[in-house]
Amino acid sequence: MNVVFLSPNFPPSLYLFCARLRELGATVLGVADASYESLRPELREALTEYYRVPDLHDYDALVRALGHFTHRHGKIDRIDSLNEYWLETEARLRTDFNIPGLNAETIGRVKRKSAMKRVFDRAGVPTARGRVVRSAPAAREFVEEVGFPVIAKPDVGVGAARTYRLENDDDLTAFLAGRARMDYILEEELTGELLSFDGLVDRKGHIVFTSSLVYGLPVLDAVRGADMWYWIDREIAPDLAEVGERLVRAFDVRERPFHFEFFRRPDGSLAALEVNMRQPGGLTVDMWNWANDIDFYRAWAEVVVKGTTTVHTDRPYYCVWAGRKAGKPYRLDHQGVLDRFGALLVHHERMDDVFAPAIGNYGYILRGPDLALLATAAAGIQELATPAGRQ
């Protein structure tokens, strides 16, 4: 099996997906704009061949790369990046090279938030009222319908980038004057607990792994400067599982991981926020592994190579992420965190700057069967030396 992996060097942990593919006998073909010498040794060992392009945004260069691979190795069977940023590029390449998976015709429903809402509606899943607005009158008409506050976000976007909370008419006026030249969708603000239904689907559309994240605060608050913390729950609420499984069918997810976001509203009901056809960001895959004592990287590779996999998800542990941001006066320095909470820590590392606004410049991962104990530790890690406490 010939598998092309776009940007296998970033995010850094992606090399493990390539390594597991190679272990299962796949021919792994990497394409990126980094020099071969800059790739970590484990990635170089996993790749059968590497093709460097001047810029991954240069589609003609990518076509030449896949043409080269086809000439050298035969038909390309799969292409992936497991990275939201490159999903549309993957889809276009699949179309042009007749590769199975999301293609140019189907990618819109999982990239455009307005298209997602139409699928939510057809599946009978509640979601925030929203509308793509291309003019000031259209934006004001929508606000008159739902009232402030509203959330403005790119119709096609990644994470919380270029997302704004508009609380009044002054905010709306400023947004309309300064917004980027792209389609924006305005949504009524939903309140409640942010959580997710995540997993892996095999080639026939069967869910073979599930998990759920619970966020300690909204991602938009983290982007504004607050410290993010979230955890992998040991139990998935039945209604969350039912709605999540319904959306897997509605979006016809196959042979890939997924990350569906919801609000648990104050009345206990669920409302869909958005879907992502990839694993959650940061080090969440590693957190899945620690929470379940599994190897998700291998599970994904088995789905690609063999069509399915078996994953034991007993969820014996909660797994908590506690991020810290550069320049904040934390009560405990790094060594203090290790000394005080070392028994609960399974990993810690500095994060790439691109992830810092949402999840922090440095992250600590804690594991254990007692969520209250882990939450107390996360609060201690993020506690500031000033009376303000956790931000």
Please give the residue ranges for each predicted region.
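Conserved ATP-binding module of the ATP-grasp superfamily
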Residues: P126-R129, E145, P149-A152, A161-S196, ...
